[in-house]
Regions:
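A Rossmann-like FAD-binding core segment of flavoenzymes
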Residues: 5, 72-100, 105-106, 168-267, ...
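Glycine/Thr-rich phosphate-binding loops of Rossmann-like dinucleotide-binding domains
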Residues: 43, 121-122, 161-162, 184, ...
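A conserved FAD-binding loop/helix module that cradles the flavin
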Residues: 161-165, 273, 279-328
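Glycine/small-residue-rich loop that forms an oxyanion/phosphate-binding "nest" at active or ligand-binding sites
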Residues: 79-101, 105-144
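FAD-site-proximal beta/loop scaffold in flavoenzymes
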Residues: 6, 118, 123, 128-145, ...
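Beta1-alpha1 glycine-rich phosphate/pyrophosphate-binding loop at the start
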Residues: 2-3, 7-77, 149-150, 155, ...
Length: 328
């Protein structure tokens, strides 16, 4: 028999946005559950140190995740791990069915999608073949395996520069490879990476193939985009940080989204579907930081409380205030 659980709000994903949303809905005395496919923390678990979260000059990613979880649970949010959500559908009566891979159904009149994203792949030959055998998307998870090795880091944003710097703790040499001649990482992050004597920066260059032997990566075939010159770069590992795509597949076909799959919301974080809210890295916005994720989540949780109050009183849902800069 299928297990059915009823709540006032279901939150999909236990990253910073999901746990913050759970904190606020819990404080509003709403029956709240946070469903997480893995472990609480989201991208915090893949980040060694956080230095730009107000109040914490220097905090380990997993420590901040633990603090978030404890805070949310203190105010009544139930966090269920190893509970991947397979689909979210809205009934005619306005209730949502959130179905997990195991077949459990979580029913609620409101849902906040905070499912984050997954790393974007290079889509080059050898990437899948050598995944876990030289190809990685997580420096903290796999960096220690490359002590004394030569490795590549691919990307031009904060993640690529920060992780290249981190990986020099283990690797003897790190090639930081970027397809453009300028980096989009913040200036401070760039300066730190570029000043590291173990890092060699290679610009205007792409990886065409990841090559290996006997089941392990041995080198990468790279190509300069300006000259067309190709060469082999000897390395036993490649860490790929070229962005990520939103985990919105469970709902994307039923809600307004942009070309990349990010969910479009109003100023209260409500999507085009009444009662369905979004926060954090699944939402279409310019910045993707821990601070913006928890800001989104705070607004979404307040929006949920207002939506439920109106629903209980038989009133229409309150209209969201216009977005900043929107025409009247």
């Amino acid at each position: 028999m299928v297990a059915t659980h009823e709540y006032e709000v279901v939150i999909v994903g236990a990253g910073p946005a999901g746990m913050c949303a759970g904190l606020y809905t819990g404080r509003s005395m709403l029956r709240s559950v946070v469903l997480e496919r893995g472990f609480p923390g989201g991208e915090l678990l893949n980040t060694e140190v956080i230095e730009d979260y107000i109040g914490f000059e220097h905090v380990l990613g997993h420590e901040l995740a633990t603090k978030f979880q404890a805070h949310a649970e203190k105010f009544g949010a139930e966090i269920r791990t190893s509970t991947p959500v397979e689909s979210v559908t809205r009934r005619a009566d306005g209730q949502f069915d959130c179905v997990t891979e195991s077949g459990e159904v979580f029913v609620a009149p409101t849902v906040i999608v905070t499912a984050g994203g997954t790393p974007v792949k290079l889509d080059v030959p050898g990437e899948i073949e050598y995944a876990g055998k030289g190809v990685s998307y997580c420096a903290i998870c796999d960096g220690a395996f490359y002590k004394g090795h030569t490795i590549l880091v691919i990307g031009g944003g904060d993640a690529a520069c920060e992780e290249a710097d981190f990986l020099t703790r283990y690797a003897e040499k790190v090639y930081l490879v970027h397809r453009r001649d300028t980096f989009r990482a913040s200036k401070l992050v760039q300066q730190r990476a570029f000043a590291n004597p173990k890092i060699e920066v290679i610009t205007d260059t792409v990886v065409d193939e990841i090559v290996g032997a006997e089941g392990l990566m041995t080198h990468a075939r790279i190509r300069n985009l300006k000259t067309g010159a190709a060469s082999d770069l000897i390395a036993t590992g490649i860490f790929i940080f070229v962005g990520f795509k939103p985990n919105t597949g469970i709902i994307r076909d039923h809600v307004e989204h942009d070309a990349a799959g990010y969910l479009i919301t109003d100023s209260m974080m409500q999507t085009s579907v009444p009662g369905l809210f979004a926060a954090g890295d699944v939402r279409a916005q310019l910045t993707r930081q821990v601070t913006t994720a928890v800001g989104d989540a705070t607004t979404a949780a307040i929006g949920v409380e207002k939506y439920l109050t109106a629903r209980k009183n038989g009133q229409p849902a309150p209209a969201a205030p216009p977005m900043l800069g929107a025409s009247a």
